[in-house]
Amino acid sequence: MNNKPENILVCVAWPYVNGEPHLGHIAGNNLPADIFARFHRMIGNNVLMVSGSDQHGTPVTIRAKEENTTPKKIAEKYHKVWSDTFKELDFSFDLYTKTGTDNHKETVQNLFNSLNENGFLEEKYSEQPYSEKSEMFLSDRYIEGDCPHCPSRTKGDQCDDCGKDFEPIDLKNLISTIDNSEVTFKSTKHIYLKLPEFQEKLDEWIKSKTYWRSAVKNQSLGFLSNGLIDRAITRDIDWGVEVPVNGYENKRIYVWFEAVIGYLSASIEWSESKNNKIQKKDIWKDWWLNPDSKHFYFQGKDNIPFHTIILPAILIGSGNYNLPYDVVANEYLNFSGRQFSKSKNWAVWVSDFLKEYDSEALRYYLSSIMPESSDSDFTWESFFDSNNNELVATFGNLVNRIQSLIKNNFDNIVPETENLDDVDNKMLLDIKNSFESAGDFLEKRQFRNRLKEIMLSLIHISEPTRQAEIS
């Protein structure tokens, strides 16, 4: 570990606030990010952990229609739900904000203008999916059709199965997932980000990341091998950040373009807020412009290209901002063998869980089954086993025995260390080595291995304390 404190930026995926959080949201990116941030604070690094609610985009407007209210009211309602949930789980955000702030709007528009001034934006007319039944243009996630490159049924402009990009118009047998109607296409103008301009630089940069998880690196290089295409960064919607271009008053900036800029806007907001105890308003630059700083982005696997392709292109094209040091993308947490689904109501909602069980038990269990390299499964049986056989039987009993020894032999006062024999010294050395090993696992973002190392250490030292209690 370094002796000089490092500037560590911990960026946590911004959730759509169109519903309540379930356990899959927590295990996928929020919990590992919090563990990582706490670890780096403990070893003396300067940590800034930021995230916020993604209040824009079609999911929020659809939920507003379902509840017969406005997108703003939905966005604020569920922002509070998510924010309160994170507090209940004791997540240590330096700032959890939202995309509906003036600061975020200004930051997004500033980067948009920088990209435009640097020649990386272009206006084009294109045919975009449209629902005659709902009288609205459809975002990528609300169209479904047959992939033009493989037999899969897919959504949007990218196939999760074959990994290839395409235009929505290339999909066959298209339907709107909002109203199940046939999709038509209408000509409309949009502003595009010239991603091919960044192809060579991104390829070189990603290949240099020898420590990235293989799934992250391989998926990113797969996108590049298919050849990057220009991506529209505006949409025909009326909810979101306004486009700072004449003639685009009835359009908004594409939610995924502006959402990934949220990490920067949140850092700036924190820098100017009372939460910044240093009270240096431009201190955000210590994380974003200092090349020695390290950025860690905690995501689900479905968000990989947005943080290894889209965000780096934006940062390169708009200024001298630091690029991600690592994109820590987890697989999915399933529930009893099936993927969590809000629409199918197949989930364990965090609010329901916390009504019955302690948040620390949840944090421990999710850490032990964290889906780092493959999908993992939440079951109630394994949660109870984890709580009873590990937290209570191993950790809890060890703490109880040590407290009893101190109470019965030293009048509840922790004694000075003296008269250590070889067995004592070996146990202390084993504990030291075990926790150093656990720290190494955390440095490498291997959270399950870290927890296993700690629990093995506790099991190892439990026997001597048990014998001491007996004697």
Model-predicted segments: where are they?
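Structured secondary-structure scaffolds
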Residues: 2-51, 103-106, 172-408, 450-454
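N-terminal, positively charged nucleic-acid-binding surface of large information/translation enzymes
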Residues: 2-205
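A short small-residue
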Residues: 58-64, 91, 373-382, 435
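Structural signal for well-ordered, non-membrane alpha-helices
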Residues: 83-86, 112-116, 396, 403, ...
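Non-catalytic interaction-recognition regions
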Residues: 182, 421-425
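Long, amphipathic alpha-helical stalk/connector segments used for oligomerization, subunit docking
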Residues: 378-382, 387, 405, 409-416, ...
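Aromatic-residue-lined binding/catalytic grooves and analogous aromatic/hydrophobic interfacial grooves
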Residues: 447
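Single conserved hydrophobic/aromatic residue that forms the stacking wall/gate
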Residues: 459-471
